[in-house]
Regions:
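Alpha-helical packing segments of well-folded alpha/beta enzyme cores
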Residues: 4-8, 41, 45, 83, ...
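Acidic/histidine-rich alpha-helical segments that form the ligand environment
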Residues: 67-112, 130
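Catalytic cores of transferase enzymes with a strong primary signal for eukaryotic protein kinases
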Residues: 1-14, 45, 50-58, 83
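Short, contiguous alpha-helical
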Residues: 21-70, 110-175
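A generic structural signal for well-ordered alpha-helical segments enriched in polar/charged residues
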Residues: 10, 14, 47, 93-100, ...
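Long, hydrophobic N-terminal alpha-helical segment
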Residues: 1-33
């Protein structure tokens, strides 16, 4: 959990606010939108883990996983225009809640496949991985590409020290 999150935070550390908020940098979304999405998923996971600990099926989490695109669209609509300070406050707070809930389960409860019938043979740890670090790993290369693009100097600011083809002829004929 921690190493992937750290890679994500290191990647975006150098980005200014306008780069984080720039629309359409990753598909139709901004980097900030992706961070909000991750927080929303992990918040849903916290609710789901609470339900599991109470012996209940985490129906909303399972429905979200069954239709990730729709869940993402709804969370995007709910959180559009969210303040960056709030985003960066919520991201670690929700992750801490996930980690606290992990401590509530035994190793067997986390790792045994088939223990929870509604997971279709998966372990609880596999579900947690899908929602947390596996999701971050899928988006990390996209975020890193935005960072590289944002940090790269624009080509049009480069001044060529060698004449372009045809420039010699223009200066020669002017003499």
């Amino acid at each position: 959990l921690d190493s992937v999150r750290e890679r994500l935070l290191v990647a975006i550390d150098e980005l200014p606010d306008d780069a984080l908020l720039a629309p359409n940098t990753i598909g139709n979304w901004s980097v900030a939108d992706l961070l909000v999405q991750q927080t929303a998923w992990e918040s849903e996971l916290v609710t789901g883990l609470k339900q599991v600990s109470e012996g209940q099926k985490p129906a909303r989490l399972l429905a979200a996983l069954a239709n990730r695109e729709e869940y993402g669209r709804l969370r995007y609509e709910e959180n559009q225009g969210r303040d960056l300070d709030r985003i960066f406050d919520d991201l670690p707070q929700v992750r801490m809640q996930v980690e606290e809930w992990l401590e509530e389960f035994t190793e067997k409860q986390l790792s045994q496949k088939g223990l929870y019938p509604w997971l279709s043979g998966q372990s609880l740890a596999q579900l947690i991985a899908r929602v947390t670090y596996e999701q971050e790993l899928r988006t990390l290369p996209l975020v890193e590409a935005v960072v590289r693009k944002w940090q790269a100097p624009p080509d049009d600011l480069m001044i060529s020290l060698t004449p372009k083809l045809g420039e010699d002829e223009a200066t020669d004929s002017a003499n």
